[in-house]
Amino acid sequence: MNIRRKNRLWIACAVLAGLALTIGLVLYALRSNIDLFYTPGEILYGKRETQQMPEVGQRLRVGGMVMPGSVQRDPNSLKVTFTIYDAEGSVDVSYEGILPDLFREGQGVVVQGELEKGNHILAKEVLAKHDENYTPPEVEKAMEANHRRPASVYKDPAS
């Protein structure tokens, strides 16, 4: 092999190694910023497709409805705890900060935070439903999937 070919080979190897390193670093950086979307039922029972449940300490977004009667505010701080639910289950949420003006019981919310033991979410951000016609696409899709059940499931057994 002549010297010119060796130099080209070394340059090609260096470029490929640099490209592989760059791709690896970008994927590592993106992995730490990805928040997966779950419903309360998916946190309890796993995603429908894979039955994989989120791990404790995982960052995630959870969408559902604020359970009526569940909002508890600490009178000495901005700490708030509440429960969000869907058709399959409910999870407790703790948040410290100012809640959106549209936040209230029975309203749709998306919380962003970290999963703790006991299916408890330590929220870093709370997003409330904008108006009576707006639903975040992830929440709309999840709620539609949760409510696609036969009418007999929802009938009152006393009737």
Curated annotation (Swiss-Prot):
Result of changing H130C: Can still form a covalent bond with heme, but blocks heme release transfer to cytochrome c
InterPro entries: CcmE, CcmE-like_sf, NA-bd_OB-fold
Segments in the Periplasmic topological domain: 30-159
Recorded topology in the membrane: Single-pass type II membrane protein
Effect seen on changing H130A: Abolishes heme binding
One GO biological process term: cytochrome c biosynthetic process
Residues reported to bind heme: H130, Y134
Region annotation (Disordered) ranges: 132-159
Recorded GO CC terms: ATP-binding cassette (ABC) transporter complex
Positions with biased composition (Basic and acidic residues): 132-147
Parts of the chain on the Cytoplasmic side: 1-8
Transmembrane segments: 9-29
GO MF, one example: heme binding
Pfam families linked to this entry: CcmE
Gene3D superfamilies on file: Nucleic acid-binding proteins
Keywords: Cell inner membrane, Cell membrane, Cytochrome c-type biogenesis, Heme, Iron, Membrane, Metal-binding, Signal-anchor, Transmembrane, Transmembrane helix
Subcellular compartments: Cell inner membrane
Chief place where the protein resides: membrane
Assembly description: Forms a ternary complex with CcmC and CcmD. Interacts with CcmF. Shuttles between CcmC and CcmF for heme delivery.
Record-stated family: Belongs to the CcmE/CycJ family.
Function: Heme chaperone required for the biogenesis of c-type cytochromes. Transiently binds heme delivered by CcmC and transfers the heme to apo-cytochromes in a process facilitated by CcmF and CcmH.
Descriptive protein name: Cytochrome c-type biogenesis protein CcmE
Organism in which the protein naturally occurs: Escherichia coli (strain K12)
